[in-house]
Curated annotation (Swiss-Prot):
Name this protein carries in UniProt: Target of rapamycin complex 2 subunit MAPKAP1
Source species of the chain: Ovis aries (Sheep)
Residue ranges occupied by any SIN1-type PH domain in the UniProt entry: 382-487
Family affiliation: Belongs to the SIN1 family.
Residues given in the record as a 1,2-diacyl-sn-glycero-3-phospho-(1D-myo-inositol-3,4,5-trisphosphate) binding sites: 393, 428, 464
InterPro entries per record: CRIM_dom, PH-like_dom_sf, Sin1/Avo1, Sin1_N, Sin1_PH_dom
Region (Interaction with ATF2): 468-522
GO molecular function term, any single one: enzyme-substrate adaptor activity
GO cellular component terms, semicolon-separated: early endosome; early endosome membrane; endoplasmic reticulum; endoplasmic reticulum membrane; Golgi membrane; late endosome; late endosome membrane; lysosomal membrane
Phosphoserine sites (modified residues): 128, 186, 315, 356, 510
Length: 522
């Protein structure tokens, strides 16, 4: 241990010791502010004055040279140590080594042995450019694929394939829908067909895409070439079609509807379509007749009898007297219920109660009906839509679409972009079953361009009346069509409505008769 009292030696020793050991540079900052050597060479002119500059003989300001280590510099980057030459050399060697790995050195050697012309010719052999005869025995993969998929070329719905979204999932907005096909065979109709469509497609485009995929997969039976022959209905998860709601509007975009399960249903009333042939059997009974619709002529007469009795009694339980069927031209001869309709060679029968006969007055109606009237009655069960306006008591009329078929009457409001529903109540769609219809009467006919009719139906044990207006021709067609449907369906609601109406009429007649009697006695 040595004791030193010379600040110059101590300062130099500390500077040299901290050149390689002080990474922070704080010692340099502390020691550079108090330089002993500089104070000895240039003592301050006044006490407490430690000037850092002196005036030269020529009057110029000269900077002092600090007596410090060469590694210590007075600059703003005093805390950063520069890399040594050794580190830079090692870094350069490392980069050269990496570059050598990427490069491959090939040593060029002169060819000593001379090769013959034959050997040189074999190295670069000349190829023959003659056209080869086509090999008819082997087909290309494209030809094989085209033969395996002939329906792709003859698919009448190819124009709708552009709405297929299977190749755009993740890049464009698409919608995945499970479509049930009630028109399919009994085994495959239980399984839905998954369709991925573009979100910008309309309902009509989606129907075309379904038909295109259906045809491409080779499903049976074949579809109609006209897309307008089909419509989309809301369906349950098990494939059951929800008939309480009307079909989706074909002009609306598909992203407007949030249904993930739909059903493709064929509509038979579109113009220009080959509709399925409807078979009707006429059952004459006391005070009227009924038209029973059948699918084919293979149906048994027992099924026709059950339908006729059920329609005659309505929603009541089939109990009480038993009935039998007789041919219209063969009275008192019962029809074999186990036989088919095809074996009977007749389309008109009589419903007769057991232990009775037509001679007893059970059936006395044998009127002839005009052929045109029968055709109108048969066509009345086909679906047809009309544009009418509903009349309200406390608000303006509402434009809607009235769809009439043999099973139900659908009332769908027509949404208009100009009409604002901000201050008015929006009309809800209504679906009325044909068994709940009671009457359809012409209320008023002012001119050929304006007429009003009233539709009466049963709702929650109460009779409701709806009033519609349109031109006279449309109103008369609607009234005639609905009345034909009501005549062919002997519903309980209609019978109860007329019975209640008759009771009210009798009470009014009795009240007026008693009033006249009292006035006559006075």
């Amino acid at each position: 241990m040595g004791f030193l009292d010379n600040p110059t030696i101590i300062l130099a020793h500390i500077r040299q010791s901290h050149v390689t050991s002080d990474d922070t540079g704080m010692c340099e900052v502390v020691l550079i502010d108090h330089d002993v050597d500089l104070e000895k060479i240039h003592p301050p002119s006044m006490p407490g004055d430690s000037g850092s500059e002196i005036q030269g003989s020529n009057g110029e300001t000269q900077g002092y040279v600090y007596a410090q280590s060469v590694d210590i510099t007075s600059s703003w980057d005093f805390g950063i140590r520069r890399r040594s030459n050794t580190a830079q050399r090692l870094e350069r060697l490392r980069k050269e080594r990496q570059n050598q790995i990427k490069c491959k050195n090939i040593q060029w050697k002169e060819r000593n042995s001379k090769q013959s012309a034959q050997e040189l010719k074999s190295l670069f052999e000349k190829k023959s450019l003659k056209e080869k005869p086509p090999n008819s025995g082997k087909q290309s993969i494209l030809s094989v694929r085209l033969e395996q998929c002939p329906l792709q070329l003859n698919n009448p719905f190819n124009e709708y394939s552009k709405f297929d979204g299977k190749g755009h999932v993740g890049t464009t907005a698409t919608k995945k829908i499970d479509v049930y096909l009630p028109l399919h065979s009994s085994q495959d109709r239980l399984l839905p067909m998954t369709v991925v469509t573009m979100a910008s497609a309309r309902v009509q485009d989606l129907i075309g895409l379904i038909c295109w995929q259906y045809t491409s997969e080779g499903r049976e039976p074949k579809l109609n070439d006209n897309v307008s022959a089909y419509c989309l209905h809301i369906a349950e998860d098990d494939g059951e079609v929800d008939t309480d709601f009307p079909p989706l509007d074909s002009n609306e975009p598909i992203h407007k509807f949030g249904f993930s399960t739909l059903a493709l249903v064929e509509k038979y009333s579109s113009p220009g379509l080959t509709s399925k042939e409807s078979l009707f059997v006429r059952i004459n009974a006391a005070h009227g007749f009924s038209l029973i619709q059948v699918d084919n002529t293979k149906v048994t007469m027992k099924e026709i009898l059950l339908k006729a009795v059920k329609r005659r009694k309505g929603s009541q339980k089939i109990s009480g007297p038993q009935y039998r069927l007789e041919k219209q031209r063969q009275p008192n001869v019962a029809v074999d219920l186990e036989s088919t309709l095809e074996s009977q060679s007749a389309w008109e029968f009589c419903l007769v109660r057991e232990n009775s006969s037509r001679a007893d007055g059970v059936f006395e109606e044998d009127s002839q009906i005009d052929i045109a009237t029968v055709q109108d009655m048969l066509s009345s069960h086909h679906y047809k839509s009309f544009k009418v306006s509903m009349i309200h008591r406390l608000r303006f009329t509402t434009e809607l679409q009235l769809g009439i078929s043999g099973d139900k009457v659908e009332i769908d409001p027509v949404t208009s972009q100009k009409a604002s529903t901000k201050f008015w109540i929006k009309q809800k769609p209504i679906s009325i079953d044909s068994d709940l219809l009671c009457a359809c009467d012409l209320a008023e006919e002012k001119s050929p361009s304006h007429a009003i009719f009233k539709l009466t139906y049963l709702s929650n044990h109460d009779y409701k009346h709806l009033y519609f207006e349109s031109d006279a021709a449309t109103v008369n067609e609607i009234v005639l069509k609905v009345n034909y449907i009501l005549e062919s369906r002997a519903s309980t609601a209609r019978a109860d409505y007329f019975a209640q109406k008759q009771r009210k009429l009798n009470r009014r007649t009795s009240f007026s008769f008693q009033k006249e009697k009292k006035s006559g006695q006075q």
